[in-house]
């Protein structure tokens, strides 16, 4: 299966809906390293901003263009540590997809590695980054 720009756009929009609808449950999971209970809220606000920005992308847009738009939207909308980390992950993913019209499984895995690496470089205690690293390995 290949991932087109339209598929990535729709996935981000759906992810924003899912995170928003489950933000209280995610907040309740937030106990380490700081138990402030706002991870779900911050991630929801962050990805909702990216979702708003990526909605205008046409079905013909490349996966590279959509990923770049998402990365920019996440960065501009980043809230809290989790939002910043999410934006860093996607900045790396965007770099990994740069120049591609579509992405196959190998390209997605490589992009996830870029995302994980990008975020790890910026975070001192990368607890939530383990998921991205594990996904890239799969």
What are these regions (language model features)?
Residues 1-25, 29-30:
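N-terminal amphipathic/basic leader segments beginning at the initiator methionine
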Residues 5, 21-22, 52-73, 89, ...:
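Transmembrane helical cores of multi-pass ion-transport proteins
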Residues 21-26, 30-32, 39-54, 67:
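N-terminal cofactor/phosphate-binding cores enriched in small/glycine residues
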Residues 33-43, 73-90:
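Conserved phosphate/anionic-ligand binding catalytic regions in large, soluble enzymes, centered on
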Residues 40-41, 120-130:
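A structural signal for small-residue-enriched, beta-sheet-centric alpha/beta enzyme cores
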Residues 75-79, 98, 124:
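Alpha-solenoid HEAT/Armadillo repeat architecture
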Residues 131-136:
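Conserved small/polar residues in nucleotide/adenosyl-binding loops
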């Amino acid at each position: 299966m290949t991932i087109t720009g339209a598929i990535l756009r729709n996935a981000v929009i759906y992810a924003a809906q899912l995170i928003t609808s489950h933000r209280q449950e995610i907040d309740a999971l937030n106990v380490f390293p700081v138990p402030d209970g706002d991870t779900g809220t911050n991630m929801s606000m962050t990805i909702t901003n990216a979702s708003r920005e990526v909605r205008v992308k046409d079905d013909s847009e490349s996966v590279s263009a959509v990923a770049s738009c998402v990365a920019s939207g996440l960065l501009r909308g980043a809230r809290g540590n989790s939002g910043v980390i999410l934006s860093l992950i996607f900045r790396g993913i965007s770099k990994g997809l740069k120049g591609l019209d579509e992405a196959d499984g190998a390209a997605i895995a490589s992009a996830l590695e870029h995302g994980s690496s990008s975020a790890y470089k910026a975070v001192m205690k990368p607890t939530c980054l383990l998921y991205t690293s594990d996904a890239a390995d799969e």
